[in-house]
């Protein structure tokens, strides 16, 4: 007997034949939503491969789309941000082959840059950029992915963004630069040196009017003094 449970099992197993037969028998279940407003495509995209080849997941997606699932439908939202199929692939399923298949069909690459950042997934970053995501994406957040990477200490991802054109001097909603955020967190010096290498300015005032140069100049670590002096000379 076809049920929501049996369809859920088929989707997670990438059993596209059972899924197709089940939806043929019970087309009324196509519109079912799981927790967090996930439709069957979102469930599929959030399912990890666990050693399986992605081809079956792609075929399962095709069955769902052929049966009428909307490629552009989202699950839950937070403000202007949307949990899209590609976001589920990037954030939970980590299935970039399926993500690219959906992107080729016209799925939006937006809303997924921070998910790639959280997972420190540069391959996902490159995939999203390939299909039109903005490196300094502000479509659903008030800060750029680069500042998100800095805030989450994803410094490798942050540098990957800089290498792909991100603005190293972007400011947060509160007017803070990456330098300000890192000084507040007490990040290791090597990350300051990395930002300086990419042209970060130290003369931009923060919310309290203090620049990164001023704050660095008061540090006990002489490496910060030297960097502050260098930034001051460049500014």
Task: List each model region and its residues.
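Ankyrin repeat domain, specifically the short helix-to-loop turn at the C-terminus of the second helix
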Residues: 23-28, 61-70, 100-108, 126-134, ...
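Ankyrin-repeat boundary/"N-cap" motif
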Residues: 2-7, 32-49, 74-88, 108-116, ...
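Ankyrin repeat A-helix N-terminal signature
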Residues: 9-14, 43-56, 84-95, 115-122, ...
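Ankyrin-repeat and related helical/solenoid repeat scaffolds used for protein-protein interactions
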Residues: 155-156, 163-210
